[in-house]
UniProtKB/Swiss-Prot annotation:
It catalyses: a 5'-end NAD(+)-phospho-ribonucleoside in mRNA + H2O = a 5'-end phospho-adenosine-phospho-ribonucleoside in mRNA + beta-nicotinamide D-ribonucleotide + 2 H(+); NAD(+) + H2O = beta-nicotinamide D-ribonucleotide + AMP + 2 H(+); NADH + H2O = reduced beta-nicotinamide D-ribonucleotide + AMP + 2 H(+). A motif (Nudix box) lies at residues 159-180. One of its GO terms (biological process) is NAD catabolic process. Its EC number is 3.6.1.-, 3.6.1.22. A divalent metal cation 3 binds at residues 174, 178, 219. Zn(2+) binds at residues 98, 101, 116, 119. A divalent metal cation 1 binds at residues 158, 178, 219. This is NAD-capped RNA hydrolase NudC. The gene is nudC. Residues 125-248 form the Nudix hydrolase domain. The keyword Metal-binding applies.
Length: 257
């Protein structure tokens, strides 16, 4: 899967180091390897975008290294490929040596994995499953400001799935821990790879069942029920959180007409 780049190799270039990628002109570079000084570098093709290959190069550039968040408002498919590249780059960087025997490892030629030639151990990229849920109560939606969101954004509740827990159990637990609310009528909506750092967001909607809001101050700054036409500052378009909010708001509005 890995190859040495030649002058005329072309496509989209994910040049990544330590969970950042190279974004000259604030966008993912497209063109020939020679155009970006990549001739002779090792690269992996990790997908196709608009019929052109997407290449991953493990390299740090002196400037224009930025978070993949800068691509979040672009096409979802391109953002997903960029996220894959950043996650794979970090996986290869952090798995140079075997955790069991300490010997140097090498990439598999057939799958996204690192192999130890000494003890034959095989490592795969770690993915952290998360849940995210929009909760409706009549014509209102539960929105919260998280401690990590200091910009005033309100969003839906989310959290990591714990060991030995189903997705449904994780939703109920996270909602209760963060807001003291019980839910019912849980429904799966969609999923979204989320490279911050290596998550897979699993999105649900649910209805309010019982309880009064009591926030976990370690996780939330504020939370409340917001009528569909009186919403606070929301997450950016392109995020699964924004989709959940918009879907819930649309149902509230339709039922109110």
């Amino acid at each position: 899967m890995e190859r040495t780049l030649e002058n005329l190799d072309h496509g989209w270039w994910i040049v990544s180091h330590e969970q950042k990628l190279w974004l000259p002109k604030a966008e993912l570079p497209y063109g020939r390897a020679a155009d970006f000084g990549l001739t002779g570098e090792k690269a992996l093709q990790i997908g196709l975008w608009e019929d052109a290959p997407v290449w991953l190069v493990l390299q740090k550039r002196e400037k224009d290294m930025a978070s993949v968040r800068q691509l979040i408002d672009q096409d979802a498919g391109l953002f997903q490929l960029a996220g894959r590249g950043v996650q794979l780059a970090e996986f290869y960087r952090s798995h140079k040596y075997c955790g069991y025997c300490g010997h140097e490892m090498h990439p598999s030629k057939t799958e996204w994995a690192m192999l130890c030639g000494h003890c034959r151990e095989r490592y795969y990229p770690q993915i952290a499953p998360c849940i995210i849920v929009a909760i409706r109560r009549d014509d209102k939606i539960l929105l919260a400001q998280h401690t990590r969101h200091r910009n005033g954004v309100y969003t839906v509740l989310a959290g990591f799935v714990e060991v030995g827990e189903t997705l449904e159990q994780a939703v109920a637990r996270e909602v209760m821990e963060e807001s003291n609310i019980r839910i019912k009528n849980l429904r799966y909506v969609t999923s979204q790879p989320w490279p911050f750092p290596q998550s897979l967001m699993t999105a649900f909607t649910a209805d309010y069942d019982s309880g009064e809001i009591q926030i976990d101050t370690k996780e939330l700054i504020d939370a409340g029920w917001y009528r569909y036409d009186q919403l606070p500052l929301l997450p950016a378009p392109g995020t699964v959180a924004r989709r959940l909010i918009e879907d819930t708001v649309a149902r509230c509005r339709a039922d109110d007409e």
